[in-house]
Amino acid sequence: MNRISALILDWAGTTVDFGSFAPTQIFVEAFRQAFDIEITLEEARVPMGLGKWQHIEALGKLPAVDSRWQAKFGRAMTAADIDAIYAAFMPLQIAKVVDFSAPIAGVVDTIAALRAKGLKIGSCSGYPRPVMEKLVPAAAAQGYAPDHWVATDDLAAGGRPGPWMALQNVITLGIDDVAHCVKVDDAAPGISEGLHAGMWSVGLAVSGNEFGATWEEYQAMSKAEIATRRERAAGKLYAAGAHYVVDTLADLPEVIADINARLAKGERP
């Protein structure tokens, strides 16, 4: 049938952890613990969506972070430095990720409704497997359990922005056409992942990394601030190539209905 048959969902900022705070705070702590270097939450968010080693590498190349690093050590960050920060990051992230495992509002009901229509639920993450092995059961205990998940270090080919994690979901779930899949993510590398895999890519402008607020902060925000942040986040996701941008996963059923109408007319991603 020429319609959407599977979703490939990101984790932090998409299905769990409103605002994607678990990884950002841990990057700040890991830089401080390993080398006594301060980075801001805003800096920590910039490369979000990449595998965590690659994320640390990208942080080291940010001009402001590189400047601080050069001032302290008289040289650029090396692969050995990245390894040391990653070594600090991993136990911190494993210890903390369960605290950020609650499904985002609307996720559990939306997934149930889409499953009732026959859709399969795949997922992938920038988290490495040891972190996912803590996160997945914690989220399941609170009502969110996808049919499959892939960690950023599972595949020899690598992670985002490449297509491999998304395509591994296609293989495992037995989906016969990548154009019948929707990749949903709150960060640019995940949008690129979906495009590279030949899928429809949908960005989430409010629940994730680009909006960058906790649920409580979001609830207390003025309409003007929400609009400003939403516009900024949506702009980044559209610039990455998103076919659609909505606020949260709860808005996805309307998008899927629109994509199904386009597929029926013979359109492809």
Swiss-Prot record:
List of catalytic residues: D10, K52
Record's keyword terms, sorted: Hydrolase, Magnesium, Metal-binding, Schiff base
EC numbers on record: 3.11.1.1
Cofactor notes: Binds 1 Mg(2+) ion per subunit.
Cofactor section: Mg(2+)
Gene Ontology CC entries for this record: cytosol
Domain of life: Bacteria
Pfam hit, one: Hydrolase
InterPro entries: HAD-like_hydrolase_sf, HAD-like_sf, HAD-SF_hydro_IA, HAD_sf, PGP-like_dom2, Phosphonoacetald_hydro
Molecular function (Gene Ontology), one example: phosphonoacetaldehyde hydrolase activity
Positions that bind Mg(2+): D10, A12, D186
Catalytic activities: phosphonoacetaldehyde + H2O = acetaldehyde + phosphate + H(+)
GO annotation, biological process: DNA repair; organic phosphonate catabolic process
Protein purpose: Involved in phosphonate degradation.
PANTHER family recorded: PHOSPHOGLYCOLATE PHOSPHATASE (PTHR43434), PHOSPHONOACETALDEHYDE HYDROLASE (PTHR43434:SF19)
Subunit structure and binding partners: Homodimer.
Protein name: Phosphonoacetaldehyde hydrolase
